Structures are given as C-alpha cells and as structure tokens.
C-alpha cells in the first residue's frame, strides 16, 4: 500500500515539475499551430503554480486556448486575472510584463485587454539591460520578432 501511495505521489510530483525553460520554449511555439497551442495549454494545466511567472504563463495559456475550448469568455477572464495577479505580486518582474505585453498585442482588438501595451514596452525597454543573459536573450527574441 505504501509503495502504491509513493508511486502516485512521485508521479504527480514529476508531472508537475516543468522547468521554466520548458515553459518558455512551449510559449514561444504556441502561436504556430492549434496543436502547439493545445500542447502549451496542457503543459500549464499540469504545472505547479509555485511562482508568479508560472501563474502568468498559465494565464497566457488560458487566453491563447480560449477560442479552441469553446469557453472563450470564462477562460479570457480567468487568464487575465492570473496575469494581473502575478504582476500585482511582483510588479518589478520583467518577464511578467513581457507575458502581458505579448498577450495584449496578439489578442483580437475586440477583446478589451489592451491598456498596458505602452506601459509594458517602456518597462521592458527601461529594465532589459539589467537582466541575466538567458532571460535578456529570451525577451530580446520576442521583441525582435
């Protein structure tokens, strides 16, 4: 009985232990196809929400996948709340601003979630040079796309 419990516990832990690098890679390819969007959504559904950055990526996954899911309004609202909640917790985190910027820039204009585009661009521009190299390169790749 203890072995069964231990197996399920470790299985659950391993499934939820996605690295931030894996999440970033999935996020950058999510807009390429419906399959990639669904893959990113599924990845974030299984990810432990142990950081504000992961919360924001989960919010982005909900917003990206909302059209495919048939729960457009609900998922857009929930995704926005996760992104805004993450930024509220860590307002100086540049990656959170990049996530919100990328979401707001790519949502259809009919969706009323576009108020922070200029604010986030300026924040990123002002703080990018101070970031560690891997994060700096990741954000530069988004900006230069």
What residue spans do the PLM features occupy?
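Helix-turn-helix repeat elements of alpha-solenoid scaffolds
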Residues: 28-42, 72-80, 113-114
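Bacterial Sec-dependent N-terminal signal peptides
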Residues: 1-20
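Terminal, low-structured helical/coil segments at or just beyond the last alpha-helical repeat
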Residues: 115-145
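Conserved structural position within tetratricopeptide repeats
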Residues: 45-48, 81-88, 126
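Specific register positions within alpha-helical solenoid repeats of the TPR/Sel1-like families, i.e.
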Residues: 21-34, 63, 67-70, 105
